[in-house]
Amino acid sequence: MEFRPLRADEIECRVSTVSEKGVSLLLYKDARCDMNVLDESIGPLNWKREHTRDNANCIVSIWDESKSQWVSKEDTGTESYTEKEKGQASDSFKRACFNWGIGRELYTSPFIWINASDVNLIPKNNKYTTYDRFSVEEISYKDKKIVGLKIRNENKKKTVFAYGYFDEDIDNLSKKIGQAKINLLKKEVERIRMADKQFL
């Protein structure tokens, strides 16, 4: 069973770190995204979730018609700051869905850094914070890896991060320089991406 990669509107952005120089972001999915993908891909009656150990663990099972049995994958979650039991149940469910491959491509995200000029920073207790909201404006994949990503600051109403390449970029390039040179460019982008990961 393989699941499609997530669309831009299904991916959330979370602020990871904040300093006077800017903020770093992480990409994540919520439990509703997982439920929607499961419903869409295999049907709402062909999967189920169970929680054990006081919601610490979640088992997501998918019906295998060829074997006439449920196939299950399990993972554990962590508590949220606001709602302990609900947050833990949601987190364990999302992690179990990662085990099935839903949203696993998010692990290939580049390091997302937003400069201070593109975010509203607020001094607080000798540190900085921000209440800006960020969204994934566009995303592209190749071989289950993120190769293109654009992030929008909804408060400033502009694109504040751009990485890699997109299908329309390739189409435009192919008309100008030919497919052979495009393939070389793709390899170079991938080489730089791997080098960045090793550096980080």
Give a label for each model feature.
Residues M1-S19, V23, W113-L200:
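Interfaces that engage single-stranded nucleic acids at replication/repair/recombination sites
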Residues A31-F166:
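Positively charged, aromatic-enriched nucleic acid-contacting surfaces
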